[in-house]
Structure formats: structure tokens, C-alpha cells
């Protein structure tokens, strides 16, 4: 993200090909692909906010390389639900699977899924040899697609009390380290910027999770505002 900036939101090395749509398969969102291990993992993602890293690759492969969805919308869908989500890592991983950030696409067939996820399923659209993947038609179950329309609801916070001449540590969605300058007498602010969450929305479960993490930091105050607004409160006059 530091190196490429917003460029990570576009195909980095190669244009993803083929692309039949810019949405996400309804069957993936509804955990109804017919691949039991994948469907169960998506259901667990909604409940817990977690998904095994290998399973994330399987889901991305089905979304991008089997359903032929451009990677961006499915990546946004997964990021929205992950408690440990990092947009840069997520976006670049999806691009790697889709072949837009690698020299080939990533595929996993049913035997691979069965091996690593204690499954014995057969006769699915993934129950093929790897040589067949490049010529497979989009399975009927994956053809219905939708956009992923999501938003993060941030609750307005009460005014916080800050001293202008006191060192201020600013925490954010990606930095809630309870040991950060733990031995210093400073004022601590968890800053939730609406513009960030508008661009990279996450679920209410994710917001609740970071609020729980913030409870581990003594004296931290929560502020829903842009960074510029915060600087006006703490910069010396």
C-alpha cells in the first residue's frame, strides 16, 4: 500500500482475463455454491469474522477464475466481514489468485479441498483435473451476480477532552497495539475517519471488535472525525 497507493485497487501487473462481470456471485454471498467446505467456511465467516487463509484462496479462485468475476467486488465483500482484514493484503492476495498480480491464476480442484479440509465430496463443478480449468464454462450455480452494496455505520461520538500542549498518540482501525508507548504519559485517541470507512467499509461486527480491543488501552478516547479535525484540537496554537 505504501509503494503503490490506490494503485492496489486496479489490476497491477496484468488485466484479469477473462472477466464476465464486475459483481459477485449470489451463490458465494449466500454460501450456496454446492462446495460444502466452501459454503461452511463462508457461513462461519459471517458468524465469527474469520476464515482460514487457505480457504480464502479457494473462495477467491471460485469467485474470480470459475465465476469470472473481476476480483475487486468479491475482495471488498470478504474484507467487509474479516475481523483481521487488511485492505492491502486482501486486495493483493485476490489479485494474485486472479492472475492480475501474478503470472498465472490460482486454481484448486475438489481433491485439493477434500485433502486439506477433511472433506470427501465428489461430483461438483470443481471435481475436475487441473488441465480442464482453463476451458470450463461458468457453472450455472454461479451465473447470478450482484453488486456488493455495503457501508459502515459509525456512531457519532461525544466531544473529547484534549490538551493542546500534550503529546497525543493517534490509533486507527489498523493500529490498536496496547503496548505502544505504554510507559509514557500521553493522551490517546482512537480516530475513526468516515472517509476511510466510506472507501473501505467493514461490518458492524468489525467495528464492535475494534471497540473491544480499544478497551485494553487505558485512557483512550474515541473520536469519529477526519484527521484534520483532530489536528485542530491538539496542535499548539
Predicted feature locations:
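Active-site-proximal binding-pocket segments
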Residues: 1-154, 159
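Trp/Phe/Arg-rich N-terminal binding region typifying the photolyase-homology
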Residues: 1-17, 30, 43-47, 72, ...
Amino acid at each position: 500500500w505504501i509503494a503503490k497507493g490506490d494503485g492496489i485497487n486496479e489490476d497491477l501487473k496484468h488485466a484479469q482475463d477473462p472477466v464476465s462481470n464486475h459483481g459477485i456471485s449470489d451463490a458465494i454471498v449466500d454460501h450456496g455454491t454446492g462446495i460444502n467446505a466452501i459454503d461452511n467456511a463462508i457461513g462461519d465467516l459471517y458468524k465469527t469474522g474469520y476464515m482460514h487463509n487457505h480457504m480464502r484462496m479457494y473462495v477467491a479462485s471460485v469467485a474470480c477464475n470459475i465465476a469470472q468475476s473481476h476480483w475487486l467486488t468479491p475482495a471488498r465483500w470478504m474484507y467487509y466481514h474479516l475481523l483481521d482484514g487488511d485492505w492491502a493484503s486482501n486486495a493483493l492476495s485476490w489479485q494474485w489468485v486472479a492472475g492480475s498480480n501474478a503470472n498465472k491464476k490460482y486454481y484448486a480442484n475438489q481433491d485439493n479441498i477434500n485433502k486439506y479440509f477433511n472433506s470427501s465430496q465428489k461430483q461438483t463443478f470443481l471435481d475436475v483435473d487441473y488441465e480442464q480449468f482453463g476451458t470450463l464454462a461458468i457453472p450455472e450455480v454461479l451465473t447470478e451476480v450482484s453488486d456488493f452494496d455495503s457501508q459502515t455505520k459509525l456512531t457519532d461520538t461525544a466531544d473529547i477532552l484534549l490538551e493542546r500542549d500534550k503529546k497525543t498518540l493517534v490509533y486507527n482501525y489498523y493500529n490498536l497495539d496496547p503496548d505502544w508507548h505504554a510507559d509514557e504519559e500521553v493522551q490517546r485517541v482512537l480516530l475513526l475517519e468516515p472517509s476511510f470507512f466510506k472507501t473501505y467499509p467493514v461490518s458492524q461486527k468489525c467495528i464492535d471488535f475494534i471497540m473491544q480491543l480499544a478497551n485494553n488501552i487505558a485512557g483512550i478516547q474515541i473520536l469519529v472525525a477526519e484527521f484534520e479535525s483532530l489536528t485542530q484540537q491538539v496542535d499548539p496554537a
